[in-house]
Amino acid sequence: MAAAVPQRAWTVEQLRSEQLPKKDIIKFLQDHGSDSFLAEHKLLGNIKNVAKTANKDHLVNAYNHLFESKRFKGTETISKVSEQVKNVKLSDDKPKDSKSEETLDEGPPKYTKSILKKGDKTNFPKKGDVVHCWYTGTLPDGTVFDTNIQTSSKKKKNAKPLSFKVGVGKVIRGWDEALLTMSKGEKARLEIEPEWAYGKKGQPDAKIPPNTKLIFEVELVDID
């Protein structure tokens, strides 16, 4: 369901005046802009922190661009959002090879993400950060093939989350891509297509058949 289109809150003169605090503009943009729009303009996160790094001209341009592009909250699907956020995060990479794997147009992401518990929406992992996760992996028929969540209280005490460097190929691609869109504390359900999971070969040791979609519940508990 599409969100109601917001109205312009200020004129150009009001936007540029000293009387209007930057925080008010940032709050308006965060309230009404889509996640990918905010990511592109580096407006995600705590308002105070954004206000420190964003100058007034940048905010005025973002405000005008929001209404020109009509990329309001609720206008994009989750897969579109994650693709946009992924592209923004990749923009920090070296641009020397325009035909590298990252810049090829591969179409929409090969996974869907449903948020089960919201994170802090401030701390997002970057490529190369170490992330710590609890997870359960299931096949489409509900069979659990892997988990690090212990049910017995004795084992729970000694249980540790899975820790790895994100975005560098240590895990299946669906995980690498999805975790870059999650904030600390977030729990999400990921449905990952075979192309971004174990593909045509499957994973016989884990009893994952070839060409199998995998479902994970992943909780991002910490980022280093």
UniProtKB/Swiss-Prot annotation:
Disulfide bonds: none annotated. Pfam families: BTHB, FKBP_C. GO terms for cellular component: nucleus. InterPro entries: FKBP3 (IPR043368), FKBP3_BTHB (IPR041200), PPIase_dom_sf (IPR046357), PPIase_FKBP_dom (IPR001179). Its main location: nucleus. It comes from the Eukaryota. The modification N6-acetyllysine is found at K99, K170. CDD domains: BTHB_FKBP25. Belongs to the FKBP-type PPIase family. This is Peptidyl-prolyl cis-trans isomerase FKBP3. It comes from Mus musculus.
